[in-house]
A protein has these predicted regions:
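A short acidic, Gly/Pro-enriched loop at the edge of an enzyme's catalytic core
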Residues: 99-111
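Conserved catalytic loop of SAM-dependent methyltransferase domains
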Residues: 187-212, 220-222
Length: 268
């Protein structure tokens, strides 16, 4: 993993500022639309998100869950709850480390990780914590920058290599998929987003055609990938009890009734 410049503070907080730039707003729109799709058929009571709350307000409004909890290493990301269509959801913010969630086991219906894995040292431990707090059939939705793209190449630029979002880890979709599988989290869907290169504002409007072309011709090279996985719990198969006893063969090849052996034969 590349090391982010410590003078910039928390890389996730720096990422939140980057989302306000022209390029960051392009990414935020694509990720917000994707999250809204992935949350469309996700139900439950408790939704947990680690950081970047401001970038996903539209998706949160459309979410069917009533309680939303935002976690983060700082409390700057927490915003007041906003009404959803005909209802309102509660919003709470708690300071926490991503690999030590202050939540009970099997207590959360869905978890959102917006680039959390990109900027944590122990990404696998974060997923392990997510698996712990999810209920059976609960879902995790995560976003990561794709190193197998022009965005990944930009991370090797000397001027950008220690600044968010370029200083994060090099997690490929395949590695993340392997980790999920090892933890019993079954990958349901994966989407590739943002096929235009990370160029300045003057060129962004001229590259809209790359989004359609990228989805069709080089889908694995999107600058961002999103994954939704579900926690599968295998049910134990009970052993079938042996209620009947094997009949004993008597002389003359007659079969002894089991009822007589159990004392239930009628007297005669």
């Amino acid at each position: 993993m590349k090391v982010c410049d410590p003078r910039d503070g928390d890389p996730l907080a720096t990422l939140a500022k980057w989302y306000t730039t022209p390029l960051g707003r392009q990414v935020a729109r694509a990720e917000n639309a994707c999250l809204e799709r992935l949350l469309g058929d996700t139900f439950g009571h408790y939704l947990v998100q680690f950081g970047a709350s401001g970038q996903f307000e539209d998706a949160a409004r459309a979410c069917r869950m009533r309680h939303r909890l935002v976690l983060g290493e700082t409390l700057n990301e927490c915003r007041p709850g906003m009404p959803t269509a005909g209802r309102s959801f509660s919003l709470a913010c708690i300071r926490s480390q991503p690999d030590r969630l202050p939540l009970a086991s099997a207590s959360v219906d869905a978890v959102i990780l917006p680039h959390t894995l990109d900027f944590c040292v122990q990404a696998h431990e974060v997923l392990r914590e997510v698996e712990r707090v999810l209920i059976p059939e609960g879902r995790v939705i995560l976003f990561c920058f794709n190193p197998l793209s022009t965005w990944g190449l930009m991370r090797w630029m000397p001027r950008r290599s220690r600044q968010a979002p370029w200083c994060g880890g090099q997690l490929t979709p395949f590695r993340v998929g392997d980790w999920l599988r090892l933890l019993g989290l079954q990958q349901e869907t994966r989407e590739m987003l943002v096929f235009r290169p990370p160029l300045q504002r003057a060129y962004l409007s001229q590259l809209d055609w790359l989004e359609t072309a990228g989805m069709r011709y080089w889908p694995m090279f999107g600058g961002v990938f999103a994954v939704r996985a579900v926690k599968r719990v295998q049910a134990l198969t009970p052993l079938r009890p042996s209620w009947t006893q094997r009949a004993r063969i008597l002389p003359g090849r007659a079969v002894e009734p089991t009822a007589r052996k159990n004392g239930h034969a009628s007297s005669g």
